[in-house]
C-alpha cells in the first residue's frame, strides 16, 4: 500500500487476514493460492508476494527515479531492495517475534541477544549506506526504499538494545515525514502481542 500511495495510484483496498476477511476462500485463493497477504489485482494482472507486487508497480507506474530504465542503475537499486527484504527485514522480524509474538514467559534473553547482535551489524551497514542519502540510493525515493524502509517502523518501535545510528535515524525521520509511509506502515501491531 505504501508504494501504491507513493505512486499516486487510484485503488480500492480490501483488508484480508488477521481480524479481517478470510484468506482461505475460493475468491481469495484465486488471487493468492498460498492463502496469505498480500495480493494485487490490476486489471487482468493478479499477483502475490510483496517483492513481485512492488516490482510490477514500479515497472508499470514508476518514473525514472523510482524505477530506472537503465538496467545497471536498476540493478544497483535492486541489490538494496533485496538486501532490505531478505536480509534486514528477516533479521528485524526475529526481534519482532521475540518482543511481540512470544508470551513473556516463553522468552529467552539469549535469543534476543543473538538477534540484537545480528540486527545491529546489519543496521550499521545500512547506516553507512544511508550516509550517501538522504534515501537508500541517493536523493530520491525509489522502490528500494519501500522494500527496505518499511521495516524501520518495527526496528524503532520494538523494545531492544538498539544502537545510536545517526544516518539511519535521519532516514527513518525522512520516511516518517512522508504521508504514504505514516498512513500505511506506521500501523499498530498490538493485537499480535503474546500469540505464542
Task: Give residue spans per PLM region.
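Compositionally biased amphipathic helical and low-complexity segments enriched in hydrophobic
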Residues: 8-10, 166, 193
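Residue-level detector of family-conserved "landmark" positions at structurally sensitive sites
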Residues: 14, 50, 165, 185-186
Amino acid at each position: 500500500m505504501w508504494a501504491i500511495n507513493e505512486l499516486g495510484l487510484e485503488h480500492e483496498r480490501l483488508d484480508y487476514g488477521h481480524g479481517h476477511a478470510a484468506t482461505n476462500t475460493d475468491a481469495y485463493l484465486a488471487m493468492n493460492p498460498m492463502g496469505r497477504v498480500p495480493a494485487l489485482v490490476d486489471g487482468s494482472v493478479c499477483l502475490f508476494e510483496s517483492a513481485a507486487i512492488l516490482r510490477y508497480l514500479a515497472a508499470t507506474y514508476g518514473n525514472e527515479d523510482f524505477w530506472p530504465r537503465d538496467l545497471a542503475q536498476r540493478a544497483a537499486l535492486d541489490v538494496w531492495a533485496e538486501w532490505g527484504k531478505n536480509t534486514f527485514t528477516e533479521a528485524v522480524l526475529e526481534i519482532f517475534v521475540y518482543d511481540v509474538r512470544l508470551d513473556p514467559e516463553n522468552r529467552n534473553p539469549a535469543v534476543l541477544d543473538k538477534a540484537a547482535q545480528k540486527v545491529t551489524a546489519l543496521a550499521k551497514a545500512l547506516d553507512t549506506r544511508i550516509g550517501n542519502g538522504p534515501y537508500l540510493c541517493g536523493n530520491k525515493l525509489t522502490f528500494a526504499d519501500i522494500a527496505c524502509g518499511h521495516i524501520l517502523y518495527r526496528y524503532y518501535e520494538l523494545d531492544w538494545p538498539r544502537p545510536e545510528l545517526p544516518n539511519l535515524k535521519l532516514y527513518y525521520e525522512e520516511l516518517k515525514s512522508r504521508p504514504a509511509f505514516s498512513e500505511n506502515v506506521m500501523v499498530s501491531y498490538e493485537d499480535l502481542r503474546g500469540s505464542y
